[in-house]
Amino acid sequence: MGNKKKLIHKGLIDKFPDNISVFVDVFAGSSIVGMNVNADIHIVNDSDSNLVKLYELFENYDVTDIINHINSRIGEYGLARERTKRNEFKDKRKIDEYKSAYMKFRADYNTNPNVLDFYTLMFYSFSQQFRFNNKGEFNMPCGNDCFSHKNEEYIKNGCEFFSKCTTKIYNNDFRELLKELLKMKCHEKMFFYFDPPYLGTTATYNENNGWSEQDETDLYSELEKLSEYNIKWAMSNVINNKGRVNQMLIDQIDANNYNVHTFDGFTYMACGKGNSNAKEVLITNY
């Protein structure tokens, strides 16, 4: 969420068209972008069913109930109420206690998983992200963050967005989503935003070859198809990551005369090694 929030402050939404009727967030992730877009209808999609469970959490639960549950678990397990970065937090013994509390909570969640505990775990996991092993167990290590007032604001915004806006939630691969949406009579009113996994980065969501060159190629084909329908779209991506250039993306931009928008002073940061100095851009067909 952090990267997109920073880009929103740097004018990401301002680069979108005015008067959007249907906003399609193809790789919604935290859905922070969609929450900041004014549209008549929001289509929120992600292929990760765990993220879709969070959208449904915001849609179906009261904000007070969510926050109360999180605070209850913090008290029950003795989770940290402040950041515990080792070079800033002086009490090393406390850090170990908080880590043990997290591991206990994680083990209990894996025994009896539920969406409220899953969401609570994320606030204390490394980089506040999630990951599951082959057994379906949450296995993200303990991080140094905690549940904060900023997190409470995000929950309030999320609940308001999913409960009060006209939203339609999908849990599809991007290829299947576009195939389905382009059959709708209102497809010409749609604006598509893509924030795919970035080829060549090592973010948690892209471990174990989660995003392949074939996926990248298929995505480019879908973008071309939308352009053929005269449908506007925008895509966030990274062209250069620590010296590794995404030549596939550059060739696609050049071949189709897409526009590339940059954000002064913004560097893409991901949970993973080797992602420093990766400049994020916005690519559009308008």
List PLM regions with ranges.
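Conserved alpha-helix/loop element of class I SAM-dependent methyltransferases that forms part
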Residues: 3-19
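Class I S-adenosyl-L-methionine-dependent methyltransferase module
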Residues: 40-168
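Mobile active-site "lid"/loop adjacent to the S-adenosyl-L-methionine
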Residues: 134, 138-146, 198-218
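Short, conserved active-site loop motifs that form the nucleotide-linked donor/cofactor pocket
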Residues: 166-167, 190, 258
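Short loop/edge segments at beta-strand edges and connector loops
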Residues: 170-172, 264
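Short amphipathic alpha-helix with an adjacent loop that forms part of the alpha/beta core around
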Residues: 178-187
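Long, positively charged, glycine-interspersed low-complexity recognition regions
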Residues: 199, 208-286
